[in-house]
Amino acid sequence: MDVTKIKNPRFLKNMSTKQLIELSADIRKFLIEKLSKTGGHIGPNLGVVELTIALHKVFDSPKDKLIWDVGHQSYVHKILTGRASEFDTLRQYKGLSGFPKRSESEHDVWETGHSSTSLSAAMGMAIARDLKGTDEYIVPIIGDGALTGGMALEALNHIGHEKKDIIVVLNDNEMSIAPNVGALHNVLGRLRTAGKYQWVKDELEFLLKRIPAVGGKLAATAERIKDSLKYLLVSGVFFEELGFTYLGPVDGHNFDDLFENLHYAKKIKGPVLLHVITKKGKGYSPAENDKVGTWHGTGPYKIETGDFLKPVDTAPSWSELVSETVRKLARTDKRIVAITPAMPVGSKLEGFASEFPDRMFDVGIAEQHATTLAAGLATQGMKPFLAIYSTFLQRAYDQVVHDVCRQNLNVFFAIDRAGLVGADGETHQGVFDIAFLRHVPNLVIMMPKDENEGQHMVYTAIQYDDGPIALRFPRGNGLGVKLDEELKKIPIGTWEVLREGRDLAILTFGTTISMALEAAEKLAKDNISVKVVNARFIKPMDEKILHDLLESNIPILTIEEAVLQGGFGSAVLEFAHDHGYHQAVINRMGIPDRFIEHGSVKELLNEIGLTTAHIIDRVKTIIPRKQKRA
């Protein structure tokens, strides 16, 4: 079947199981081919082909609400709802989003990108349905990895308490991104081997009903027997005790089993949890045999071999540079303990985990716990190294403030993917951390201009014993600069003048340093002399350099690959105001007040006006203003 001709999922209603099996093969072939060119979340989507088809056949989207947790497994859903013809633009600039998008389709009822949100959203929709008196089914689809998130467990508790009609589909592939961890994962493991839960439950209840109710004592005994047998025989008790009817485990690649259980779930009053077992990467051997999460999300690849088409780049990734520097330091510093919230591969911590298995903790999708775990370690003199993406640190804000910074604990936050990340789009852009961290007392924030300075900042963070410290670094590879053999501490709160100039000073850090230097070089040809300062410490700032600049009345331009509101430029403006420099000319460039969608980082920077050319244009608008005032 040509899946690009699909307009909506209604055609599934009249298809036979044999036809659906053929459709599954066509969809897998389509995904493998398209994603080999664009990259994307291939593993999760190959694993949910039959499940997604079954959901759209049994339910009536968009009337019935299919809510995809995390959303990276929504490609099959997009195909079945008429978007296959757009897959050449998947995750490309102005193209199809890699996640559910309400503006794309009426079938996308919930937007996401972070995990564990679907159940809370489903509960909200179910309450709204009941208040309005409508009858649609509410069906959140959540993975076993996302179910480890505290928010999901909070929602399970509320749904079970309120007894709302919600059908939760647990897509259990034993992996979220990397292999799942934790006690809840072990519970699911027991469930997988428990056989047909509902059959055992029904038989048990049938037998117990045949016990004659002669007197209260016998009835009480029968109830105790029932409870004991329930705990002994039925592993689904975890969900039953939360108030759910548990169905499964069900083969997520068997249409007959899926249809039988989905139709049965529709008849049950109250919340239902359907436990579906799927194989991540099914149908493509490199992805199917992946044990560590490499094929969760990828760039382009060769279909025949499974080899990734990596750009020619000999420089190490920023994640690798940071993790390997910490690993080297951990050989002599026994205080160092690494923590990751389910991102050991993305954060390049495999080497650390292999060398120091007793000092490496993957806590699962649990950013709040990871942060307070680090705080607890710090109270006992350890040096916790929390490797966390900027976008996911948002989920642990209270723990950063209340548990770490308020107690002034020595936690090292390694904030990965800081700045624009590109194809994953608005849910993953790491542009808010400066704004939500800068105003928190006791916290040091820094960002290097290159990987050599980066390794020295890692060393500085490990040696820093006066409170929490955060190192921001971007996604992707470094610049390929030579690394010093000996690590050194960088004095906290010191900046670095990279280029002298008399007409204007650019204050910037991180990825925008190279833009500023290039702009200054080109402006020099127009007789505009620009000073460039590496403002590597966002907090505390270098007050000496700031006073010198402000006293000289030189115009200042701040540049940051982060949101302007509450950002670094705002800090410079506050400093000038608070110290009485009310005539200072300070301009800011950065991320505007809107969410930045997907595309390459280069395309996005051009769209928001944050390139060398834009810097040159801005400087030329500032300098005449300065001359006119003179």
From Swiss-Prot:
Gene Ontology BP, a term: thiamine biosynthetic process
Entry EC number(s): 2.2.1.7
Gene3D superfamilies registered for this protein in UniProt: 3.40.50.920, 3.40.50.970
Domain of life: Bacteria
GO molecular function list: 1-deoxy-D-xylulose-5-phosphate synthase activity; magnesium ion binding; thiamine pyrophosphate binding
Pathway noted in the entry: Metabolic intermediate biosynthesis; 1-deoxy-D-xylulose 5-phosphate biosynthesis; 1-deoxy-D-xylulose 5-phosphate from D-glyceraldehyde 3-phosphate and pyruvate: step 1/1
Cellular component terms per the entry's GO annotation: cytosol
Residues reported in the UniProt entry to bind Mg(2+): 144, 173
Family label: Belongs to the transketolase family. DXPS subfamily.
Record's function text: Catalyzes the acyloin condensation reaction between C atoms 2 and 3 of pyruvate and glyceraldehyde 3-phosphate to yield 1-deoxy-D-xylulose-5-phosphate (DXP).
Cross-referenced PANTHER family: 1-D-DEOXYXYLULOSE 5-PHOSPHATE SYNTHASE-RELATED, 1-DEOXY-D-XYLULOSE-5-PHOSPHATE SYNTHASE, CHLOROPLASTIC
Name of this protein: 1-deoxy-D-xylulose-5-phosphate synthase
